[in-house]
Every structure is written in structure tokens, then in C-alpha cells.
Swiss-Prot record:
InterPro entries: 2-isopropylmalate_synth_dimer, AIPM/Hcit_synth_CS, Aldolase_TIM, Citramalate_synthase_CimA, LEU1_arch, LeuA/HCS_post-cat, LeuA_allosteric_dom_sf, PYR_CT. Homodimer. One of its GO terms (molecular function) is (R)-citramalate synthase activity. The keyword Amino-acid biosynthesis applies. PROSITE patterns: AIPM_HOMOCIT_SYNTH_2 (PS00816), PYR_CT (PS50991). This is Putative (R)-citramalate synthase CimA. Its EC number is 2.3.3.21. It is an enzyme of class 2 (transferase). Signal peptide: none annotated. GO terms for biological process: isoleucine biosynthetic process; L-leucine biosynthetic process. HAMAP family: CimA (MF_01028). Keywords: Amino-acid biosynthesis, Branched-chain amino acid biosynthesis, Isoleucine biosynthesis, Transferase.
Length: 483
């Protein structure tokens, strides 16, 4: 958690840390590094809250090789410390302005101090990939003699390659008398590969973050490492893999860092198919164009429509909507979808449903209907929305506040439909101007999810708030109807 929070722009409150820690614990993560106790009094309160939350995981604090850091960690009731000692000459001489012998001595002394105070100690070599191998072994050996429970090799600026990682970890795991961890950064995009290589070569633990968050290019991704071990190496990690996607979305929402659409496993496109030939293959055998079942990590595959869509895509999408079309009707729906795709239009699930219901001459009464809404906003007013909806023939009035008028009205809608659409999450929100000028027609596209199912919907108006309401309502109706 600490490394993930070092992502630029991320600052987690105590409440957010608790939510993430509980989610990680439910996934059966062994060790949670909740933060750095030296940072501030507020950070110590957050770490202590996590440590006292009754979790099964070992709760850890980051510490420098400074006794004061250990004292602050002890204030937080943590089980262990991640004790980090600089081991490359670059870090020793320029960062802390000491020599090798002094660093060895201090690292051993602080390790012994922490052990004397009842802490589990993981002694970490910072910038180990640029360290003298013999000095690295010496500082690790001193740490073991001082009582260190675990060791860690930090590839601090992502300089390792898998072949070198294998060589290093075969040597360290055979020559040292304590389990060793791997901590990789993703500066060259090799963090996951290096982490898996280290584990295959004898490492007993890996430092990872949800969604690969972290400073600069991030850290090794938990979901990628876990699924590589489970699926490619057939190794049972003990992680509850079906909770991976849900936890990924939680972390993205709480940190405000969106997941790249093409991110492995948890990105929006990871199990999304458009091309007709691919969907045709999926209908015959899911493994044709998928390396694993999306349900394994708690999500569902998605078929999207566009200029590359084929008849198989249309057929499958209609089936998921509970609609049946004969050959002629399918052909007409297919032609209309193709025409929209050729015009460069993003075709949402709601668009397809509208096209299909028009061709099939079906009218479905919306389950959730908008009666009216009011927005109050200004530079000295907290944006507030009140909304009246008809939900399953029952009038519901609710209010919501937000960071702006759009956020406020969406929050009001969520509260109003909570009885029949609990756990619906707004995953993405996009606004495009269709025409120019101050009276421009805007299109709002949203992506909503519920229990792993993801749908898209849109609304187009000259009023951005009304377009947003229309898009969310269209999506809500689709999710509720298909439950």
C-alpha cells in the first residue's frame, strides 16, 4: 500500500487505507505495508488504525535504518517493519553521505534494536541491482546475525532483466540463511517479468501493488504476478483470485488513478472483443481468443460493437440482452450498427438495444423514469442536487452533493435507485462536443458496472447535466433489466 500511495497525486486518508487494507485482507494477502510511520502524525494514526482493524494479514511499516523510525513504527502497533538500507555506492555516498562499513554497522544495530522490541524485521537492500554483490551479501549476513527474519532485494530504478534476476536469486537463495523477497520497479516495463523470474529462482515473497501503482512507472502488479503464477506456472498462491477485479476497481476509485484500458487482466479492454472473426471464434470455444476465463478474477467478458463487428457479435450481444432475432432482423440490425460505426460513432450497449428494439418492434417501459431534478451550484455553495424518480411505479425523492453539479446529480440518482441497483459503480465518464459554440450538443458516455458486469450508455443534449442524467439513467435501466 505504501508504494502504491507514492504514485504522484495519490494521498490516502485513514478511511481509504482501511477500505483498501480490508479488501487486501479478504484476498488473503500475507503482508500489508500500510505506510511509513515517520511521515507524519496523521500517517501514524492511519497505520495504527489498519494495525488494530483485526485483519489476518501481517501489518508492516516502512523504516529507514534510523532508530527513531522504529520507535514511530512501534507507536503504530505494527507486526513488522520493512527496514531499508541503501546498498549501492551511489546511494551510500550521495544520499546519506556515509561509507559501506558504517551502513553495515547501522543496519545491523537497527535490526537488533527492532528485534529487541518484538518486531518482525525484513531487511531490504535499496538499489541492490547496482550494488557490489559481495557487499550486498555481507550486509544481508550481518542482518541475519542481528535477527532479521526476511531479506529483500530492491530493483529501485527497474534495471534488472529476467535472465540477470534468475542468476542473482539462485545465488542469494542458496547462499543466505533467510528467505528473500523481490521488490521491482517498472521503469522499463519488466517489473512483473523480473518478479516472476525471482520467484521461480528461489525468492519466497514478492512486493507488489494493485494495478501496478507506484512512483514513476510504478511497481510490479499484484494481479499480473498472481495470475502468472497461478495460470502459467500452475502454482497455488492462496490468493482469492475471484476478488482481483473488484479490488482493482476499488483501488482505482479511491486513488483517483484510472486503469489503462489495455492494462493486463484488469484493463477495460482485457476481456473485450469487437472484431467479428474473434467473436465467432469465442462462440465456438472461449479459449480461442482468451488465455483464461474472466470469471476467474471476478469479471465478465464484454462484446463491443463498431465498424469491425460481425454478425456473431450482434447475435451474442442480443442473446445477452435476452432478445431473439431471425436472420433477416439480425441482418438489418447488423447493417444499422455498421452504418453507425462507419460514421465514427461509439456504439454503446444502450445504442444496440435501441436499434434492436426498433427493428424487432419492441417497446420496453423503463424501470427507472426521471420525473424532475433541481441543481443548486455556485462559487460559495456546495453543489447539491435533488431528484424525483419513478422506480418500479414508486415515487422516490432523493438528494446528493458532489464536487460539481454533475457529480451531485449522479450521486442523487445512485441514492434513489439503491434499493434495486445496489453496488452499481460509475467506472468511466466521458464528454464529447458534437457541435461547436456555447450551445453545442454534447454527448456523455458512461461505463457502469455491477457484480463484474460492465455496460456502456450515452446521452446527448445541449445541457451537459441533462445529458449526464440521461446517460446514467439509460445505463441503470439496462443493468436492472438484465439482473
Amino acid at each position: 500500500m505504501r508504494d502504491g500511495e507514492q504514485t504522484p497525486g495519490v494521498a490516502l486518508t485513514r478511511e481509504k487505507k482501511l477500505l483498501i487494507a480490508r479488501a487486501l485482507d479478504e484476498m488473503r494477502i500475507n503482508v500489508i505495508e500500510a505506510g511509513s510511520a515517520i511521515t507524519s502524525a496523521g500517517e501514524r494514526e492511519s497505520i495504527k488504525a489498519v494495525a488494530n482493524a483485526g485483519l489476518d494479514a501481517e501489518i508492516c511499516s516502512y523504516c529507514r535504518i534510523v532508530k527513531m523510525d522504529v520507535d514511530h513504527a512501534l507507536e503504530c502497533d505494527v507486526d513488522s517493519i520493512h527496514l531499508v538500507a541503501p546498498v549501492s555506492d551511489l546511494h551510500i555516498k550521495t544520499k546519506i553521505k556515509k561509507d559501506r562499513d558504517t551502513v553495515r554497522q547501522i543496519a545491523a544495530e537497527v535490526t537488533e534494536y527492532a528485534k529487541d522490541h518484538g518486531l518482525i524485521v525484513e531487511l531490504s537492500g535499496e538499489d541492490a541491482s547496482r550494488a557490489d554483490p559481495e557487499f550486498l551479501k555481507a550486509i544481508y549476513s550481518d542482518g541475519i546475525d542481528a535477527g532479521a527474519d526476511r531479506l529483500c532485494f530492491c530493483d529501485t530504478v527497474g534495471l534488472l532483466v529476467p535472465e540477470k534476476t534468475t542468476e542473482i536469486f539462485r545465488d542469494l537463495s542458496s547462499s543466505l540463511k533467510a528467505p528473500i523477497s523481490i521488490h521491482c520497479h517498472n521503469d522499463f516495463g519488466l517489473a512483473t517479468a523480473n518478479t516472476v523470474a525471482a520467484l521461480a529462482a528461489g525468492a519466497k515473497q514478492s512486493h507488489v501493488t494493485i494495478n501496478g501503482l507506484g512512483e514513476r512507472a510504478g511497481n510490479a502488479s499484484l494481479e499480473e504476478v498472481v495470475m502468472s503464477l497461478e495460470w502459467l506456472y500452475k502454482y497455488d498462491t492462496g490468493i482469492k483470485h475471484e476478488q482481483i477485479y473488484r479490488t482493482s476497481r476499488l483501488v482505482s476509485r479511491l486513488t483517483g488513478i484510472p486503469v489503462s484500458p489495455n492494462k493486463a487482466l484488469v484493463g477495460g479492454n482485457a476481456f473485450t472483443h469487437e472484431a467479428g472473426i474473434h467473436v465467432h471464434g469465442l462462440l465456438a470455444d472461449k479459449s480461442t481468443y482468451e488465455p483464461m476465463s474472466p470469471e476467474y478474477i471476478g469479471r465478465q467478458r464484454q462484446i463491443v460493437l463498431g465498424k469491425h463487428a460481425g454478425r456473431s457479435s450482434i447475435t451474442l450481444a442480443l442473446k445477452e440482452m435476452g432478445l431473439e432475432a431471425d436472420e433477416a432482423q439480425t441482418e438489418e440490425i447488423f447493417n444499422r450498427v455498421k452504418q453507425m460505426g462507419d460514421q465514427g460513432k461509439h456504439i454503446t450497449d444502450a445504442d444496440l438495444q435501441t436499434i434492436a428494439e426498433t427493428v424487432l418492434d419492441i417497446y420496453k417501459e423503463p424501470i427507472v423514469k426521471l420525473e424532475e431534478f433541481t441543481i443548486v451550484s455556485g462559487n460559495r455553495v456546495t453543489p447539491t442536487a435533488s431528484i424525483k424518480l419513478n422506480v418500479k411505479d414508486k415515487e422516490i425523492v432523493q438528494a446528493g452533493i458532489g464536487n460539481g453539479p454533475v457529480d451531485a446529480v449522479i450521486n442523487a440518482i445512485r441514492r434513489a435507485v439503491s434499493s434495486c441497483a445496489e453496488d452499481v459503480v460509475l467506472e468511466e465518464y466521458h464528454v464529447d462536443s458534437i457541435t461547436g459554440g456555447t450551445d453545442a450538443l454534447v454527448e456523455v458516455r458512461v461505463k457502469l458496472s455491477k457484480n463484474g458486469k460492465v455496460i456502456t450508455a450515452s446521452g446527448a443534449r445541449t445541457d451537459i447535466i441533462m445529458a449526464s442524467v440521461e446517460a446514467v439513467m439509460n445505463g441503470m435501466n439496462r443493468l436492472i433489466r438484465e439482473e
